[in-house]
Amino acid sequence: MVSVKKIVASALVGVLMFSAVGCNMVEKTQAAIDKTTVATVNGEKITLGEVDSHLKGVFAQMKSQYGDKYMDDPQVAQQILQQRQSVVQGLVTDKVLGIEADKLGIKPSEEEIKKKVDEQFENIKKGMGDNFDKALEAEGYTEDTFKDVIKNQVINQAVQDYIIKDVKVTDEDAQKYYDENKQQFVAKDSGVLTKHLLFENEEEAQKAYDEIQSGKTTFNDLFTKYQNNKSENKKPIAENLGVVPAENSGLVQEFVDGLKPLKEGEISKPIKTQFGYHIIQAGATYEKGAQLPFDEVKSQIIQILKQQKDSEKFKADMDQWKKDLNVKVYDDKLQEGLKISK
């Protein structure tokens, strides 16, 4: 927690304020620092207190490492300033996207938001197991305040999906990128070209596997269907991992064990890892240095270009919305309470 500044008696404060005009001799109270406006969005203020409320875990870590006077250390102060700058940009984004969600009529209903928040909260809690409560406390969140963070993410995602809904990457775009960047598509190690589908739960993965096995659909059909989901931060995800070596692939062991027995063109049954449930497809085997053909990496290129185009479209829309909403960020105010080296 941020250390509280020394509070001077009110009469003395009056004297000091009078005598120190223009000399910066008065030390602000923590309450005054917290009320400092560090940004405005459409006239709505964001205070330093709001920013610092998201940095409780950082402050606790700094205090543990450097002691109670950690904010007096110029190097630590610089780190905190950078953290504040990052948080205030996030809060600005939340407010801008929240306003635009209402304007565009795309904000999810309260019921939809609650359902998604509860689902994500439980998935995170389940994934972290016994460490969840400690991690929450270490970051300075309660369950309710953490759910507020997730709520903003749900709303933000709805707007992001709207922004990029018409972004397309053609086969011609992919071919052009391949021709201009062939050196990127050379096997770095000997191994198997590997693709996978990643599902949130076992039921979804098993259903997809059964439909592939029955001939109702194909792995490639599902891969095409889901290949843009990663850039939109939602599952199922379809991902081309490129050539995966037999050893030191950097992948989790369960995934590696599921890939090993597969022959070219075969798929695995759903495999559980810490990330969810995977259906893996083994492709051709390539030696180190081999040029990977366009058809084998087209989906990977499309993902690369889609992410680039999505980012460009999102930035362009955000820049315009910030201008329309007269967004202002006061970087100098983010230094309040810190001793920054000049």
Curated annotation (Swiss-Prot):
Task: Report the InterPro entries cross-referenced here.
Answer: Foldase_PrsA (IPR023059), PPIase_dom_sf (IPR046357), PPIase_PpiC (IPR000297), PrsA_foldase (IPR050245), Trigger_fact/SurA_dom_sf (IPR027304)
Which top EC class is given? Answer: isomerase
List residues with covalent lipid attachment of type N-palmitoyl cysteine. 23
The name of this protein is Foldase protein PrsA
Q: Where is the lipid attached (S-diacylglycerol cysteine)?
A: 23
Q: Name one GO molecular function term.
A: peptidyl-prolyl cis-trans isomerase activity
**Which UniProt key words apply to this protein?**
Cell membrane, Isomerase, Lipoprotein, Membrane, Palmitate, Rotamase, Signal
User: PANTHER family, from UniProt?
Assistant: FOLDASE PROTEIN PRSA, PEPTIDYLPROLYL ISOMERASE
Task of the protein? Plays a major role in protein secretion by helping the post-translocational extracellular folding of several secreted proteins.
**Which is a Pfam family this sequence falls into?**
SurA_N_3
Instruction: Give the UniProt family note.
Output: Belongs to the PrsA family.
Q: Which organism is it from?
A: Clostridium perfringens (strain 13 / Type A)
Q: Which GO terms describe its biological process?
A: protein folding
- Specify the superkingdom: Bacteria
Which reactions is this enzyme annotated as catalysing? [protein]-peptidylproline (omega=180) = [protein]-peptidylproline (omega=0)
Bilayer topology annotation:
Lipid-anchor
Q: What is its EC number?
A: 5.2.1.8
